[in-house]
């Protein structure tokens, strides 16, 4: 079953994006470089709980 997750900026800790992930097949935490409009740059965004 897919579960909703938030992606939070590692620099300012704001939750800018949300997505879903299958926890059975992807057990590790999700992280991706995305644009943070508060920092005004591309930063690493990591999975956070809702």
From Swiss-Prot:
GO cellular component: cytoplasm; ribonucleoprotein complex; ribosome
MF terms (GO), sorted A to Z: structural constituent of ribosome
Example GO BP: translation
Cystine connections: none
Keywords from the named record: Ribonucleoprotein, Ribosomal protein
Keyword Membrane included in the entry's annotation: no
InterPro entries: Ribosomal_bL33, Ribosomal_bL33_CS, Ribosomal_bL33_sf, Ribosomal_zn-bd
Keyword Ribosomal protein part of the UniProt annotation: yes
Transmembrane segments annotated in the record for this chain: none
Pfam families cross-referenced by the UniProt entry: Ribosomal_L33 (PF00471)
Alphabetical list of HAMAP family matching this protein: Ribosomal_bL33
Family that this chain belongs to: Belongs to the bacterial ribosomal protein bL33 family.
Protein's name in the database: Large ribosomal subunit protein bL33
Underlying gene: rpmG
């Amino acid at each position: 079953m897919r579960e909703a997750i938030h992606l939070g900026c590692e620099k300012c800790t704001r939750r800018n994006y949300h997505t879903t992930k299958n926890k059975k097949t992807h057990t590790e935490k999700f992280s991706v470089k995305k644009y943070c409009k508060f920092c005004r740059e591309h930063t690493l965004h990591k999975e956070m709980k809702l």
